[in-house]
């Protein structure tokens, strides 16, 4: 897909930042307008992250205009907002391939461009990495500058504050830009504050500030008086800030959509010494009314018609696994006031919107704080409640120590509803749920369940909720299979079920690839087993299958290394059972973006791939 660049004459002159910096400053507002329209036209045709990019158009233009990228390091946190950055850094013609197999990466990616200095995808990493780059730049001694852009959501994470605390302590030269899009631009974030920001970042104020500190450094009472006077003066017109206490020079808030003022403020700040924080106010979805009105709904979008202002409705009546979880949550909470649901800022994605509205006293969104979420749940369990942590597989990685130290060691009854297990599709390497079975399986006391359809998912959530110890139910992104939902009942822990009796080959399936495995079992007259539990493994059943079949095939949408199949291998070795075993799953490399079905086919995890691998093994 290629757009007619002739419709965007100013943008056509800015193929890369070098060309951008040659434009007169007066042309920047026009460039921003065209960039925003280009982004709208592109994403509406290709799908992708949308509202975040619209909100940082002016900031992106100003940063590349003022800073000498890629010599200067520009670090984007998370990266949802980096589409304008990609368009301005030589990837304009490829932006229509973003998030597609073999296309542009959905986030900044080091292997894709020299302008992407940090590969990202998870939140709150930018300041830590940026500080490391700033220290390296200081030792290099060539005047390289470091800028980190972080949102008001991502900055709530502990890692961001840990990094700021360290930056303030070692006083390295770096700029952190806080992109605050929680509210629309208010009147006090207008001319006065823009003028104040330029004044506070200007050379005269800075030299007086630093010179005065040096001159009176030996006289504590006078130094303290100056500091109090400075804070009082700033406090009249800008928010009081935690950032100054962390050692940052705070400037702002300023209008993040005034590209001229933003450019001047950044020019003033470029030469400042020590850690600086610029607080800008932006509107997520800026320039496209439907996205401004509903920035969450327009955060990541399918292909749509810009003229209609609406997103296409999903087809079919089969619910997603996230919806199945949310409905089960409400059903259970209606009967049990001890239920407490915890999520680290993933209410919409985890299917918890209805629950949060109907049971607000039992719902906790702890923000982007996965470590806190898990230990908070441990505390709830100690207090006699029944906590459920709803979390994506990829984000549970961030709370691994808490899972072990605060939940499993104490054998606390915390249920983990792990969404996005396995291949997730367009978000690529940083978001694949490829490792959870591997990193949980080695933890004592854990019960790990892998449903094969939405009915089993409900039954396993019910079972895990009533289990007296830590339990995890791991389910994929996307729709169920259309299975009939049965009344809830507790399942026997650690027991699989034989779905089909066959000969010679037994296929042991962990999770929702069962439907694909069923086709293969029918074609090969193989035994098919829905294993259900990764831990505790149904050892009795596995040993029976090993004794009655020539080949065992394990199938899972998880890394082969350390996964469910490895558990089968370990059991057979421990019992000295000599039987041929083929482990099928995800390979030992990070899986890039692509549609889920595309990637399953590539890794031989669709029906045709499973069958061909088994047939090759039997030769």
Swiss-Prot record:
Mg(2+) binds at residues 152, 181. PROSITE patterns: TRANSKETOLASE_2. Gene3D superfamilies: 3.40.50.920, 3.40.50.970. Pathway: Metabolic intermediate biosynthesis; 1-deoxy-D-xylulose 5-phosphate biosynthesis; 1-deoxy-D-xylulose 5-phosphate from D-glyceraldehyde 3-phosphate and pyruvate: step 1/1. InterPro entries: Dxylulose-5-P_synthase, THDP-binding, Transketo_C/PFOR_II, Transketolase-like_Pyr-bd, Transketolase_BS, Transketolase_C. It is an enzyme of class 2 (transferase). Its EC number is 2.2.1.7. Keywords: Isoprene biosynthesis, Magnesium, Metal-binding, Thiamine biosynthesis, Thiamine pyrophosphate, Transferase. CDD domains: TPP_DXS, TPP_PYR_DXS_TK_like. Thiamine diphosphate binds at residues 80, 121-123, 153-154, 181, 288, 370. One of its GO terms (molecular function) is 1-deoxy-D-xylulose-5-phosphate synthase activity. Its cofactor is Mg(2+); thiamine diphosphate. One of its GO terms (biological process) is thiamine biosynthetic process. It catalyses: D-glyceraldehyde 3-phosphate + pyruvate + H(+) = 1-deoxy-D-xylulose 5-phosphate + CO2. It comes from the Bacteria. One of its GO terms (cellular component) is cytosol. Pfam families: DXP_synthase_N, Transket_pyr, Transketolase_C. Binds 1 Mg(2+) ion per subunit. Binds 1 thiamine pyrophosphate per subunit. Homodimer. Belongs to the transketolase family. DXPS subfamily. Catalyzes the acyloin condensation reaction between C atoms 2 and 3 of pyruvate and glyceraldehyde 3-phosphate to yield 1-deoxy-D-xylulose-5-phosphate (DXP). NCBIfam families: dxs (TIGR00204), PRK05444.2-2 (NF003933). This is 1-deoxy-D-xylulose-5-phosphate synthase.
